[in-house]
Amino acid sequence: MEDATFHFKDPASPQEISDIEQKLGVTFPNDYKEFLLQHNGMEMFDGIEILSLEGIIEYNEVQDFPEGYVLIGYHFDGRYVIDTNKSKNGLGYMLYLDSIDDIEDAINLDSNFEIWFDMLVSLNGTKYWEVNPNLQEYYKLVSE
């Protein structure tokens, strides 16, 4: 069994986050902002990357997403997206998208950033929504 690796980037400042939000025309959810204030991106499990603010700008310039959708990371052969249109409501704004799929084919992970991140780390980077979809419901209940 291999050791899990985590590479955290230096924190983003509140001003840097605000500047990116303005540039993209979105408001990031609070739990995601808290992550950025601690770690402006990271790599984990040798294949999962949560983008830095600079990476978000770079990668979102080439995405053809509707307004409010922001690519925030990669998972081996897929992408993680935040639907900022839904994030005002709390849960249900994290999406997973296979690398060749359009945004209309995204899987709604029915979670916020914090729950998604906790589950991803707890299950060693496994695509938990494919293994046991009921885990999402359980995790929502125990985290409320």
UniProtKB/Swiss-Prot annotation:
Any single Pfam family the record assigns to this protein: SMI1_KNR4
Alphabetized InterPro entries for the sequence: Knr4/Smi1-like_dom, Knr4/Smi1-like_sf
The organism's place on the tree of life at top rank: Bacteria
SUPFAM superfamilies: SMI1/KNR4-like
Protein name (record): Uncharacterized protein YnaB
Gene: ynaB
